[in-house]
Every structure is written in C-alpha cells, then in structure tokens.
C-alpha cells in the first residue's frame, strides 16, 4: 500500500507516535531501539494540526508511544483532535494515571477512552516478567481512577502460557470497581478487555505466540461461549475479533488480536483499519511503516 497524503486517508484509526520516550522497559515493545532514542523527536504540534484538519472523514486518533503521557503537549493534541471533530483515544502504561488529577485532565481535554496496559493483572510477579518491575498497585490505582472519573478503560493484556491465570482475577476486579462507583457496563460505559499474543518484532519475550483460535478458546473457558465477530469497523479481519459477555454489572466487551508475524517479520500487515501519521506527516499502514525502520529490527 502506497504512502498517502492526509486528505487521501482511508484508515478509520490513525495512530500518532506522540513521543518515543518511555518510563518503563517492557519485555514486549515493537519499537526496539527507537525507544528513548533522541534521533526520533516528539510529534510537532503544528504539523500534527495540519494533518488533522486535512483528514477527509471522522477518524479515531490514537495517541501512542513509547508512553504518550510523557509528552507535555498531550492535552493540547487531544484538544486539537476534538477541534476538528475527530475522536481521541490513547494507549498508555498507566503510571501517570495513578494520579487522579491527571485522569481528570484527560477527561476534561476530551479523551474518549484509554487503553491501559495490565499484562500482570493484579500480580506483581507477572509484571516483573512482562514489564520488568512491580507495577500492580500503580496500574490498579490507574484503573480505579478511570472508572471513578467516567473515563472508559480498555484493558490491554499481552498473554502467553505463563500469565493466563491473571485474567479471571482481573475481570473480577474490574467488575468490583464498577460496583463501587455504580458504573453500568455497556453501550454508555463500554469497558473492553483486549487480549493479545506476543508479536515478535522489536523487543519481545521468547515465548509461545498464541493463535487467535487458541485465544478464543482461552476466553471461552473464562467467560462462557463467546461468539467472535471478525468484521470490525466494516472491515473483514482474520487476526482480530471482538466479542461480548455478561457480567453482574452489564455486558462487557472483549477483543482478541493475534500478533503472529509474517515471513517479513511483521504482524497485521496491509491493514485496512490501522494507519499511522508518520514522522514525515504522511499516512501509511501501521506495522508496514515500522518494519522499514532499522531500529525496530535491532532489539536491545
């Protein structure tokens, strides 16, 4: 797929590499040696706005990183996204969201939902393996702050055979927080649990990469006979599906993504849903773009 100008964008989701700086050193990170590399600057606010105002259709603008909360212009970027009638969301490790005032700021600036990484669930020993640190308390506090302040969390968990056991306690904890703050899960507060396999690009654990059907089976064992939907945003997928399941606080949503790499060492290539605003402020398919950068091929 060719590089395209912003006005020709076809992707319903566009990621923005808000910053290449990070305050963690996760075992799984597709950025490889791009991480904390001064060669790669933060997004330029003016150039970002120039791209955003030229997009032809309403688009999900996904602020990613390394860690997007380390960019001091994040709230301004969110406000620009809203100004042009697009939908801002964010993928974060959640450490700064342990501060309730920061979550309130995200909500006030117009953030629609956040993807919160919780690879260890409630278990510090699992975080030590996946994220090289004990982060359970901070991430649980971040999750609670989101639910308390009506900022919808999508909880992201990379799974391999060593951490499947954290999923059920994590689901139970999410439900208990919704009970505590009287949040009915469903269309008006669409909490989603997103499970993903290990993508062997950049930095990654040398472990089994689950297929999508293995992960569907895992989720069925946890929450019942789910019905996977492989059509997302009107696009037929093979490596991604959504589902839902009943809880005592309403219908919770789920998503499963198989990050198996192809013969070129890339996951989810030629995606018709996921694009990225590149470092030269054009549009490309997400992983196809990163696959061309040497630093993603040389993990630390």
Residue ranges: model-predicted function:
Residues 1-4, 10, 260-300:
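Flexible mid-to-C-terminal extensions adjoining Fe-S/redox cofactors in radical SAM and related proteins
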Residues 45-64, 71-194:
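Radical SAM/AdoMet-radical enzyme domain recognition
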């Amino acid at each position: 797929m060719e590089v395209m100008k912003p006005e020709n964008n076809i992707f319903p989701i566009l990621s923005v590499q808000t910053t290449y700086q990070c305050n963690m050193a996760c075992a799984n990170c597709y950025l490889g040696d791009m991480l904390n590399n001064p060669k790669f600057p933060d997004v330029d606010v003016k150039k970002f706005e120039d791209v955003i105002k030229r997009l032809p259709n309403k688009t999900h603008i996904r602020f990613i990183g390394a860690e997007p909360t380390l960019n001091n212009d994040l709230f301004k970027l969110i406000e620009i996204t809203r100004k042009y009638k697009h939908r801002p969301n964010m993928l974060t490790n959640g450490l700064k969201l342990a501060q309730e005032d920061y979550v309130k700021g995200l909500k006030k600036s117009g953030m629609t939902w956040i993807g919160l990484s919780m690879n260890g669930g409630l278990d510090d020993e699992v975080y030590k393996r996946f994220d090289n640190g004990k982060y359970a308390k901070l991430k649980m506090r971040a999750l609670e702050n989101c639910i308390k302040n009506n900022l919808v969390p999508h909880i992201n968990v990379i799974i391999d055979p060593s951490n499947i056991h954290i999923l059920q306690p994590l689901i139970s904890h999410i439900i208990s927080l919704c009970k505590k703050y009287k949040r009915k899960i469903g269309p008006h507060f669409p909490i989603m649990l997103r499970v993903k396999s290990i993508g062997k690009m950049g930095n990654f654990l040398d472990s089994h990469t689950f297929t999508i059907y293995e992960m569907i089976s895992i989720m069925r064992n946890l929450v019942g006979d789910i019905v996977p939907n492989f059509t997302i945003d009107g696009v037929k997928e093979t490596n991604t599906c959504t589902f839902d399941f009943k809880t005592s606080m309403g219908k919770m949503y789920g998503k499963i993504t198989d990050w198996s790499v192809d013969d070129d060492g890339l996951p989810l290539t030629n995606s018709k849903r996921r694009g990225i605003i590149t470092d030269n402020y054009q549009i490309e398919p997400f992983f196809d773009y990163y696959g061309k950068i040497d630093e993603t091929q040389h993990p630390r």
